[in-house]
Amino acid sequence: MASKNSASIALFFALNIIFFTLTAATDCGCNPSPKHKPVPSPKPKPVPSPKPKPVPSPSVPSPSVPSPNPRPVTPPRTPGSSGNCPIDALRLGVCANVLSSLLNIQLGQPSAQPCCSLIQGLVDLDAAICLCTALRANVLGINLNVPISLSVLLNVCNRKVPSGFQCA
């Protein structure tokens, strides 16, 4: 009787562990729904005090004094890889299949669609920044010449490397 009871308890705990493991593993990665902000109550408007009429004064020209600290002129910013990628660079790991197939590292012809769909809504500069970030972080898992790899990936997705852009 005791062995039957302990077997039931063991089965109960095993099923609980399996249940909790499965529920924890099914995280959909969905963004949580936005929380509604409470509507603030209207604040009472202050009553404006009557303004006195200004008395006109004679205008006396004053000599112009040069500013002691002139504002330095900043040079125009050239596009570089200093921007931030608006998408998660780890998601660009799907571009590894595209890049490796183009370089004949892998047999078969994987679709470029998953990679290109990630950068589809981005302008060329943002797409270049994202792919540059992924290549520099070696998210793709391939050690390659970064500028050439960047150019190859952008060309596959019908994008162009912005002029003056350097992935350093």
UniProtKB/Swiss-Prot annotation:
Region annotation 2 X 58 AA tandem repeats B of P-S-V-P-S: where it falls in the sequence: 58-67
A- repeats: 34-41, 42-49, 50-57
Origin: domain of life: Eukaryota
Matching InterPro entries: Bifun_inhib/LTP/seed_sf (IPR036312), Bifunc_inhib/LTP/seed_store (IPR016140), Hydrophob_seed_dom (IPR027923), Plant_LTP/defense-related (IPR051636)
Location relative to the cell: Secreted, Cell wall
Swiss-Prot/TrEMBL B- repeat ranges: 58-62, 63-67
Protein name: Lipid transfer protein EARLI 1
Expression sites (tissue/organ): Mostly expressed in aerial part of seedlings, and, to a lower extent, in roots. Higher basal levels in early-flowering ecotypes.
Gene Ontology annotations for the cellular component aspect, listed alphabetically: chloroplast outer membrane; endoplasmic reticulum; extracellular region; plant-type cell wall; plasmodesma; secretory vesicle
Observed phenotype of the null mutant: Increased tendency for freezing-induced cellular damage. Reduced cutin accumulation due to lower cutin biosynthesis. Early flowering in long-day conditions.
Gene that encodes the chain: EARLI1
GO-annotated biological processes: defense response to fungus; induced systemic resistance; response to abscisic acid; response to cold; response to salt stress
Regulation: induction: Transient accumulation in response to toxic levels of aluminum (Al). Stably activated by vernalization; vernalization and subsequent growth in long-day photoperiods have an additive or synergistic effect on this activation. Induced by both cold and salt.
Function recorded in the entry: Probable lipid transfer protein (LTP). May improve freezing survival. Seems to control the flowering process and lignin synthesis. Has an auxiliary role for germinability and early seedling development under low temperature and salt stress conditions, probably in an abscisic acid- (ABA) dependent manner. Confers resistance to Botrytis cinerea and exhibits anti-fungal activity, at least against S.cerevisiae, B.cinerea and Fusarium oxysporum, probably by increasing their membrane permeability.
Keyword Glycoprotein set for record: no
Record field: compositional bias (Pro residues): 39-78
Protein family: Belongs to the plant LTP family. PEARLI1 subfamily.
Residue span of region 3 X 8 AA repeats A of P-K-[HP]-K-P-V-P-S: 34-57
Entry-linked Pfam families: Hydrophob_seed
Signal peptide range in chain numbering: 1-25
Keyword line: Cell wall, Plant defense, Repeat, Secreted, Signal
Chain segments carrying region Disordered: 32-81
